[in-house]
């Protein structure tokens, strides 16, 4: 679609979203558009420091977990000693960016609002790691903590997965992987999915929305996919195109959050409509006036804080 035909998104977003877009960080260098992935990752980490400030304090522990690929870093956020469940968090970043630091505030707030232990998994990034390595390492970490729950003093009898953007896909893919391969890591009480992508290759929102403001043009989305997948056949894998998986049975309760001006919004709508049509427990909520990645901006956006509270409330209601 010609850029001129797209919606004038920056004119339509909410006042608080505009405040975020217009917030300048004077000490921050320019985005290294032509730089290496390593430089872009470094910039992303620096840029997120401002948005992560002021998060709730709580007991935090870091552990390296063994997998067949090597060790993966994890970070445990423990808001109380008697947690009713454990929630695994997978960060967004198009499979190529992000880490436990870039999403620190999100995980702390989720732990605070749910009063559950949250474990962030620093899964391997692409293109160094190709599909399905990230999912396999997430599952390995889940199994490790299930086996060592007593040693780490965590409750693994009931678990959940949560993620934003690419992390939302990984969250649901990991839950389906455990179901399909009959791996016991505790009862999956719920899955929290903020503005994820789940397998659509084209849609109305992908045509009308997306630009330099969110890094989600059709060219951007193609680049993320090519970095993540090992080959063309992976596009149809039921753990990448999740609509090719069986969504008619034993899908854990899903909280599906959509951002109004997100090109990936139709992925969330289709996921909700598919699950609802087959009587799978799910809830969809649209957050008006928001862009993709709005969850990061709870320092300024009440809507971002609301979205985290909504997800936490949904999860605890399943326990």
UniProtKB/Swiss-Prot annotation:
Name this protein carries in UniProt: Acetyl esterase
PROSITE patterns for the chain: LIPASE_GDXG_HIS, LIPASE_GDXG_SER
UniProt superkingdom: Bacteria
EC numbers, comma separated: 3.1.1.-
Annotated active site: 165, 262, 292
Keyword Lipid biosynthesis among record annotations: no
A Pfam family reported for this protein in Swiss-Prot or TrEMBL: Abhydrolase_3
Keyword annotations: Cytoplasm, Hydrolase, Serine esterase
Motif placement: Involved in the stabilization of the negatively charged intermediate by the formation of the oxyanion hole: 91-93
HAMAP family: Acetyl_esterase (MF_01958)
Similarity section: Belongs to the 'GDXG' lipolytic enzyme family.
Localization (cell): Cytoplasm
Function comment: Displays esterase activity towards short chain fatty esters (acyl chain length of up to 8 carbons). Able to hydrolyze triacetylglycerol (triacetin) and tributyrylglycerol (tributyrin), but not trioleylglycerol (triolein) or cholesterol oleate. Negatively regulates MalT activity by antagonizing maltotriose binding. Inhibits MelA galactosidase activity.
GO annotation, cellular component aspect: cytoplasm
Taxonomy of the source species: Bacteria, Pseudomonadati, Pseudomonadota, Gammaproteobacteria, Enterobacterales
Principal location: cytoplasm
């Amino acid at each position: 679609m010609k850029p001129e035909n797209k919606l004038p998104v920056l004119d339509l977003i909410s006042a608080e979203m505009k405040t975020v877009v217009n917030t300048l960080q004077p000490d921050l260098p320019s985005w290294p558009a032509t730089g290496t992935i390593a430089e872009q990752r470094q910039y992303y980490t620096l840029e997120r420091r401002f948005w992560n400030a002021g998060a709730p304090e709580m007991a935090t522990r870091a552990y390296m977990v063994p997998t067949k690929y090597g060790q993966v870093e994890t970070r445990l956020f423990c808001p109380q000693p008697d947690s009713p469940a454990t929630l695994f968090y997978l960060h967004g970043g198009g499979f190529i960016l992000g880490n436990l630091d870039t999403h620190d505030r999100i995980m702390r707030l989720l732990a605070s609002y749910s009063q559950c232990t949250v474990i962030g998994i620093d899964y391997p990034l692409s293109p160094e790691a190709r599909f399905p390595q990230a999912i396999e390492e997430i599952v390995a970490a889940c199994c490790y903590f299930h086996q060592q729950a007593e040693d780490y003093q965590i409750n693994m009898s009931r678990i959940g997965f949560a993620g934003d953007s690419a992390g939302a896909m990984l969250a649901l893919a990991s839950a389906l992987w455990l179901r399909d391969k009959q791996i016991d890591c505790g009862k999956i009480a719920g899955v929290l999915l903020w503005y994820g992508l789940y397998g659509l290759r084209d849609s109305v929102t992908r045509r009308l929305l997306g630009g330099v403001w969110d890094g989600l043009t059709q060219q951007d989305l193609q680049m993320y996919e090519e970095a993540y997948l090992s080959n063309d056949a992976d596009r149809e894998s039921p753990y990448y195109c999740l609509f090719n998986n069986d969504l008619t049975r034993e899908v854990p309760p899903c909280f599906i959050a959509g951002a109004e001006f997100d090109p990936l919004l139709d992925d969330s709508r289709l996921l909700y409509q598919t699950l609802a049509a087959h009587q799978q427990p799910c809830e969809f909520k649209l957050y008006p006036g928001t862009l993709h990645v709005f969850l990061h901006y709870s320092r300024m956006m009440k809507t971002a804080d609301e979205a985290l509270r909504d997800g936490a409330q949904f999860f605890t209601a399943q326990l």
